[in-house]
């Protein structure tokens, strides 16, 4: 996570749902410039060490040089690491950048309603299902779940 004044921290990898829940519930929103570039640099470094099936990013703004981010997203795409970007809010600059980052990495973009924990849960489930079972498993989950998951799956599997 990142926040405040140039704060960036990466938790250790875990396969424990309990540990992941602990990490995710400890995250708080702080004012400060976005550090998406730091997240992408970290993902690139980690993906060169071991296989990463997907990168998930939840954010509301983008305040960095988009070209630098697009270059790294393209590298992630080449390495087979799709980015799933979930936008909280309706900032048009963030939306444009998040859509482009998703496209360059062969991932997907979806806006969610910040008042709906269920939507975000479904989106995170969809990414986990993709990471374990690939496109076919994601399509199957999308057919059963519908709604926001179907929108995400459509943007992921139907590229222009």
Where are these regions (language model features)?
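C-terminal "exit" segments of structured domains
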Residues: 109-160
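VWA/integrin I-like adhesion module and closely mimicked acidic/polar interface patches used
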Residues: 61-104
């Amino acid at each position: 996570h990142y926040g405040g004044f140039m704060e960036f921290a990466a938790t250790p990898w875990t396969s424990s749902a309990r540990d992941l829940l602990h990490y995710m519930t400890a995250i708080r929103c702080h004012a400060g410039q976005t550090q998406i570039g730091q997240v992408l640099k970290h993902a690139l470094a980690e993906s060169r060490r071991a296989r990463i099936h997907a990168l998930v990013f939840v954010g509301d703004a983008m305040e960095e040089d988009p070209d630098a981010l697009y270059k790294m997203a393209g590298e992630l795409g080449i390495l087979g690491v799709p980015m799933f970007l979930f936008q909280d809010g309706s900032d048009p600059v963030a939306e444009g950048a998040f859509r482009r980052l998703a496209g360059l990495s062969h991932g997907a973009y979806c806006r969610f309603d910040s008042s709906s924990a269920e939507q975000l849960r479904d989106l995170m489930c969809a990414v986990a299902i993709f990471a374990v079972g690939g496109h076919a498993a994601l399509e199957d989950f999308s057919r059963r779940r519908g709604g926001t998951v179907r929108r995400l799956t459509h943007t992921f599997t139907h590229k222009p």
